[in-house]
Protein backbone atom coordinates (compact mmCIF):
# COMPACT_ATOMS: atom_id res chain seq x y z
CA UNK A 1 0.00 0.00 0.00
CA UNK A 2 1.45 3.38 -1.02
CA UNK A 3 2.14 5.93 1.67
CA UNK A 4 0.07 9.11 1.50
CA UNK A 5 2.01 12.12 0.26
CA UNK A 6 2.72 14.46 3.15
CA UNK A 7 1.19 17.89 2.78
CA UNK A 8 3.03 20.97 4.04
CA UNK A 9 1.76 22.20 7.36
CA UNK A 10 -0.47 25.26 7.52
CA UNK A 11 2.25 27.14 9.42
CA UNK A 12 4.81 26.48 6.67
CA UNK A 13 2.35 27.69 4.06
CA UNK A 14 1.77 30.90 6.01
CA UNK A 15 5.48 31.57 6.52
CA UNK A 16 6.16 30.84 2.86
CA UNK A 17 3.48 33.35 1.89
CA UNK A 18 4.87 35.96 4.29
CA UNK A 19 8.42 35.44 3.03
CA UNK A 20 7.32 35.80 -0.57
CA UNK A 21 5.34 38.93 0.21
CA UNK A 22 8.32 40.51 1.97
CA UNK A 23 10.58 39.78 -0.99
CA UNK A 24 8.09 41.34 -3.41
CA UNK A 25 7.70 44.36 -1.12
CA UNK A 26 11.47 44.84 -0.83
CA UNK A 27 11.81 44.54 -4.61
CA UNK A 28 9.38 47.39 -5.21
CA UNK A 29 10.93 49.47 -2.41
CA UNK A 30 14.29 49.02 -4.10
CA UNK A 31 12.86 50.10 -7.45
CA UNK A 32 11.27 53.14 -5.79
CA UNK A 33 14.50 54.20 -4.09
CA UNK A 34 16.58 53.74 -7.22
CA UNK A 35 14.19 55.81 -9.34
CA UNK A 36 14.78 59.51 -8.88
CA UNK A 37 14.67 62.88 -10.63
CA UNK A 38 17.88 63.60 -12.50
CA UNK A 39 19.48 67.01 -12.71
CA UNK A 40 19.06 69.18 -15.80
CA UNK A 41 21.59 71.70 -17.16
CA UNK A 42 23.80 71.87 -14.07
CA UNK A 43 27.22 71.02 -15.52
CA UNK A 44 28.41 74.64 -15.42
CA UNK A 45 27.76 74.73 -11.66
CA UNK A 46 29.79 71.64 -10.79
CA UNK A 47 33.20 73.24 -11.26
CA UNK A 48 34.89 76.47 -10.20
CA UNK A 49 32.95 79.50 -11.36
CA UNK A 50 33.92 83.11 -10.74
CA UNK A 51 34.83 83.56 -7.07
CA UNK A 52 33.35 80.20 -6.08
CA UNK A 53 35.50 77.10 -5.85
CA UNK A 54 33.64 73.79 -6.12
CA UNK A 55 34.97 70.54 -4.78
CA UNK A 56 33.67 67.18 -3.67
CA UNK A 57 34.07 66.21 -0.03
CA UNK A 58 33.10 63.20 2.08
CA UNK A 59 29.40 64.09 2.28
CA UNK A 60 28.70 65.80 -1.01
CA UNK A 61 29.74 69.00 -2.78
CA UNK A 62 31.36 72.05 -1.16
CA UNK A 63 30.80 75.54 -2.59
CA UNK A 64 33.54 77.79 -1.22
CA UNK A 65 32.83 81.43 -2.08
CA UNK A 66 34.33 84.77 -1.02
CA UNK A 67 32.67 84.67 2.40
CA UNK A 68 34.61 83.36 5.39
CA UNK A 69 32.29 83.38 8.40
CA UNK A 70 28.94 81.94 7.26
CA UNK A 71 28.03 78.53 5.88
CA UNK A 72 24.91 76.55 5.02
CA UNK A 73 24.41 72.81 5.16
CA UNK A 74 21.72 71.87 2.65
CA UNK A 75 19.66 68.66 2.39
CA UNK A 76 18.10 67.86 -1.04
CA UNK A 77 14.49 66.86 -1.59
CA UNK A 78 13.40 63.22 -1.68
CA UNK A 79 14.41 61.23 -4.75
CA UNK A 80 16.10 64.21 -6.38
CA UNK A 81 19.68 64.13 -7.67
CA UNK A 82 22.02 65.97 -5.32
CA UNK A 83 23.56 68.14 -8.02
CA UNK A 84 20.12 69.42 -9.07
CA UNK A 85 20.66 72.03 -6.34
CA UNK A 86 24.06 73.08 -7.67
CA UNK A 87 22.80 76.35 -9.23
CA UNK A 88 21.14 77.40 -5.96
CA UNK A 89 24.23 76.58 -3.91
CA UNK A 90 26.42 78.47 -6.37
CA UNK A 91 24.28 81.58 -5.97
CA UNK A 92 24.37 81.44 -2.18
CA UNK A 93 28.16 81.02 -2.24
CA UNK A 94 28.54 83.98 -4.59
CA UNK A 95 26.68 86.04 -2.00
CA UNK A 96 28.98 85.14 0.88
CA UNK A 97 27.44 81.96 2.32
CA UNK A 98 29.59 78.89 1.69
CA UNK A 99 27.45 75.83 1.02
CA UNK A 100 27.73 72.14 1.80
CA UNK A 101 25.35 70.28 -0.50
CA UNK A 102 24.78 66.88 1.08
CA UNK A 103 24.62 63.68 -0.95
CA UNK A 104 21.98 61.49 0.72
CA UNK A 105 21.93 57.67 0.56
CA UNK A 106 19.24 56.62 -1.93
CA UNK A 107 18.39 60.33 -2.26
CA UNK A 108 16.42 60.18 1.01
CA UNK A 109 17.30 62.74 3.69
CA UNK A 110 15.90 60.73 6.59
CA UNK A 111 18.68 58.18 6.07
CA UNK A 112 21.45 60.76 6.48
CA UNK A 113 19.68 63.17 8.80
CA UNK A 114 22.73 63.33 11.08
CA UNK A 115 25.21 64.30 8.33
CA UNK A 116 25.06 67.98 9.34
CA UNK A 117 26.88 67.10 12.54
CA UNK A 118 29.61 65.30 10.63
CA UNK A 119 30.19 68.36 8.45
CA UNK A 120 30.40 70.67 11.46
CA UNK A 121 33.02 68.45 13.05
CA UNK A 122 35.29 68.98 10.05
CA UNK A 123 34.73 72.68 9.26
CA UNK A 124 34.79 75.82 11.37
CA UNK A 125 32.46 78.79 10.77
CA UNK A 126 31.14 81.52 13.04
CA UNK A 127 27.58 81.15 11.75
CA UNK A 128 25.82 78.00 10.60
CA UNK A 129 22.57 77.80 8.65
CA UNK A 130 20.67 74.58 8.05
CA UNK A 131 18.65 74.46 4.83
CA UNK A 132 16.70 71.96 2.83
CA UNK A 133 14.07 71.39 0.18
CA UNK A 134 10.87 69.43 0.82
CA UNK A 135 11.76 66.25 2.79
CA UNK A 136 15.30 67.59 3.12
CA UNK A 137 13.97 70.71 4.82
CA UNK A 138 11.82 68.70 7.22
CA UNK A 139 14.72 66.43 8.14
CA UNK A 140 17.27 69.18 8.73
CA UNK A 141 14.72 71.06 10.86
CA UNK A 142 14.22 67.84 12.81
CA UNK A 143 17.98 67.55 13.32
CA UNK A 144 18.20 71.22 14.32
CA UNK A 145 15.59 70.74 17.06
CA UNK A 146 17.88 68.32 18.88
CA UNK A 147 21.12 70.22 18.12
CA UNK A 148 19.92 73.77 18.59
CA UNK A 149 23.26 74.94 19.97
CA UNK A 150 24.86 74.14 16.61
CA UNK A 151 22.62 76.22 14.34
CA UNK A 152 21.93 79.94 13.92
CA UNK A 153 19.19 79.87 11.29
CA UNK A 154 16.96 77.68 9.13
CA UNK A 155 16.00 77.85 5.47
CA UNK A 156 12.94 75.73 4.66
CA UNK A 157 12.14 75.51 0.96
CA UNK A 158 8.66 74.06 0.41
CA UNK A 159 9.02 72.42 3.81
CA UNK A 160 7.82 72.63 7.41
CA UNK A 161 9.10 71.48 10.81
CA UNK A 162 7.79 68.45 12.66
CA UNK A 163 9.48 69.18 16.00
CA UNK A 164 9.08 72.17 18.29
CA UNK A 165 11.52 75.04 17.72
CA UNK A 166 9.27 77.75 19.15
CA UNK A 167 11.32 78.35 22.31
CA UNK A 168 14.61 78.79 20.45
CA UNK A 169 16.26 82.05 19.43
CA UNK A 170 17.36 80.96 15.96
CA UNK A 171 15.89 82.49 12.80
CA UNK A 172 13.77 80.59 10.29
CA UNK A 173 12.89 81.53 6.72
CA UNK A 174 10.18 79.48 5.01
CA UNK A 175 9.84 79.94 1.25
CA UNK A 176 7.47 78.26 -1.21
CA UNK A 177 6.00 78.96 -4.63
CA UNK A 178 2.43 80.04 -5.29
CA UNK A 179 2.05 77.27 -7.89
CA UNK A 180 3.44 74.46 -5.72
CA UNK A 181 1.34 71.35 -6.29
CA UNK A 182 3.32 69.09 -3.96
CA UNK A 183 3.57 70.99 -0.67
CA UNK A 184 0.82 70.31 1.88
CA UNK A 185 -0.19 73.83 2.91
CA UNK A 186 -2.23 72.53 5.85
CA UNK A 187 1.03 71.16 7.27
CA UNK A 188 2.74 74.49 6.65
CA UNK A 189 0.00 76.24 8.64
CA UNK A 190 0.25 73.70 11.47
CA UNK A 191 4.03 74.03 11.44
CA UNK A 192 3.92 77.77 12.11
CA UNK A 193 3.37 77.11 15.81
CA UNK A 194 6.55 75.02 15.89
CA UNK A 195 8.78 77.70 14.41
CA UNK A 196 10.85 80.18 16.44
CA UNK A 197 9.68 83.73 17.07
CA UNK A 198 12.20 85.07 14.54
CA UNK A 199 10.45 83.50 11.56
CA UNK A 200 9.25 84.78 8.22
CA UNK A 201 7.17 83.04 5.56
CA UNK A 202 7.50 84.04 1.93
CA UNK A 203 5.47 82.97 -1.09
CA UNK A 204 7.22 83.42 -4.43
CA UNK A 205 4.55 84.41 -6.93
CA UNK A 206 4.68 82.11 -9.95
CA UNK A 207 7.11 79.67 -8.39
CA UNK A 208 6.47 75.95 -7.97
CA UNK A 209 7.94 73.01 -6.06
CA UNK A 210 10.59 71.78 -8.47
CA UNK A 211 12.26 75.02 -9.46
CA UNK A 212 14.17 75.42 -6.23
CA UNK A 213 16.27 72.76 -7.89
CA UNK A 214 17.07 72.06 -11.51
CA UNK A 215 15.55 68.69 -12.32
CA UNK A 216 12.74 69.37 -14.74
CA UNK A 217 9.05 68.91 -14.03
CA UNK A 218 7.90 66.94 -10.98
CA UNK A 219 4.81 64.74 -11.11
CA UNK A 220 1.88 66.43 -9.39
CA UNK A 221 3.52 69.85 -9.29
CA UNK A 222 1.86 73.04 -10.50
CA UNK A 223 2.92 74.94 -13.59
CA UNK A 224 5.42 77.67 -12.77
CA UNK A 225 5.03 81.04 -14.46
CA UNK A 226 8.57 82.19 -13.68
CA UNK A 227 11.88 80.61 -14.63
CA UNK A 228 13.95 78.48 -12.32
CA UNK A 229 16.64 81.15 -12.43
CA UNK A 230 14.16 83.78 -11.21
CA UNK A 231 12.83 81.53 -8.46
CA UNK A 232 16.34 80.85 -7.20
CA UNK A 233 17.23 84.55 -7.37
CA UNK A 234 14.24 85.49 -5.23
CA UNK A 235 15.03 82.65 -2.82
CA UNK A 236 18.58 83.84 -2.20
CA UNK A 237 17.50 87.48 -2.00
CA UNK A 238 14.82 86.69 0.60
CA UNK A 239 17.13 84.60 2.76
CA UNK A 240 19.88 87.22 2.72
CA UNK A 241 17.32 89.79 3.86
CA UNK A 242 15.72 87.80 6.68
CA UNK A 243 18.38 85.32 7.87
Language model features with spans:
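Hydrophobic membrane-insertion alpha-helices, especially the h-region
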Residues: 15-33
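Short beta-strand element of the alpha/beta-hydrolase
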Residues: 69-77
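Conserved alpha/beta-hydrolase fold motif
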Residues: 130-131, 154
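Short beta-strand/loop motif that positions the catalytic acidic residue
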Residues: 168, 174-176
